[in-house]
Amino acid sequence: MSRREDGRLDDELRPVRITRGFTSHPAGSVLVEFGETRVMCTASVTEGVPRWRKGTGQGWLTAEYAMLPAATHDRSDRESVKGRVGGRTQEISRLIGRSLRACIDLNALGENTIAIDCDVLQADGGTRTAAITGAYVALADAVTYLAAAEKLSDPRPLSCAIAAVSVGVVDGRVRVDLPYSEDSRAEVDMNVVATDTGTLVEIQGTGEGATFPRSTLDKLLDLALASCDQLFVVQREALDAPYPGALPEPTSPPKKAFGS
């Protein structure tokens, strides 16, 4: 099998690295790297929920995505300077929020909000899928923080892990984890969000330059799910280490041992 421009096989991910505790203030903070794509993902906990959620006893999770002006070769203006958030930014923000809400029991949060912020420091394709993969780890750390603060009605509100990856058809070949040089000329481009239980959260796929048959779709999904399995391993290895900061001290008195 011939190799790609960066030396990888068609079914090979770029080197993936997840660094927890990247910044010190949020409950969860992660730097995720897929090759040259680097995204900072944070999970901040705030008291209260949106107005339409008040009085339900349920929490909420929301997400925002943005790219730094110099994340790509050509600098782009900040959207705050333009005075409006672009359609692509809104779409990806909503995708990240939907993906992470699929794995958490919002009832367990009480009326608290977890705000996910994904900021692309450097873009080389696959920024939204890298953001989802890293944001899950930041979310897991935020849940650990909430548990230590005794704000969870269920100490284990996460039902599964979430990861995402890009797949596509480039030069007639099914490939995974497309860098910009491949993504920009792909005949088929797809993003897949999956759980570690083998189910799908979301599929975004388009024929950029041509239509494609069902058999190609099956190959793309098989490759995406196999690659997500590898990402789940990276996530678990990152989360095996202790929480990378100071946890709040419990406020309730310790329970007395039976018979004491």
Swiss-Prot record:
Instruction: Give the top-level enzyme category.
Output: transferase
Catalytic activity, per the record?
tRNA(n+1) + phosphate = tRNA(n) + a ribonucleoside 5'-diphosphate
Which Pfam families would you find in this protein's record? Answer: RNase_PH, RNase_PH_C
Q: Which UniProt keywords are listed?
A: Nucleotidyltransferase, RNA-binding, rRNA processing, Transferase, tRNA processing, tRNA-binding
Task: Summarize where phosphate binds, as residue positions.
Answer: 88, 126-128
Is Cytoplasm among this UniProt entry's keywords?
no
What InterPro entries is this protein classified in?
ExoRNase_PH_dom1, ExoRNase_PH_dom2, ExoRNase_PH_dom2_sf, PNPase/RNase_PH_dom_sf, Ribosomal_Su5_D2-typ_SF, RNase_PH, RNase_PH_bac-type, RNase_PH_CS
The keyword Transferase is annotated on this UniProt entry: yes
GO molecular function terms attached to this record: 3'-5'-RNA exonuclease activity; tRNA binding; tRNA nucleotidyltransferase activity
Q: Which GO terms describe its biological process?
A: rRNA catabolic process; rRNA processing; tRNA processing
Give its E.C. classification number.
2.7.7.56
Self-association and partners: Homohexameric ring arranged as a trimer of dimers.
Describe the family membership recorded for this protein in Swiss-Prot or TrEMBL.
Belongs to the RNase PH family.
Note the NCBIfam families from the entry: RNasePH
Q: What does this protein do?
A: Phosphorolytic 3'-5' exoribonuclease that plays an important role in tRNA 3'-end maturation. Removes nucleotide residues following the 3'-CCA terminus of tRNAs; can also add nucleotides to the ends of RNA molecules by using nucleoside diphosphates as substrates, but this may not be physiologically important. Probably plays a role in initiation of 16S rRNA degradation (leading to ribosome degradation) during starvation.
State the name under which the record lists this protein: Ribonuclease PH
Q: Which organism is it from?
A: Mycobacterium sp. (strain KMS)
**Gene behind this chain?**
rph
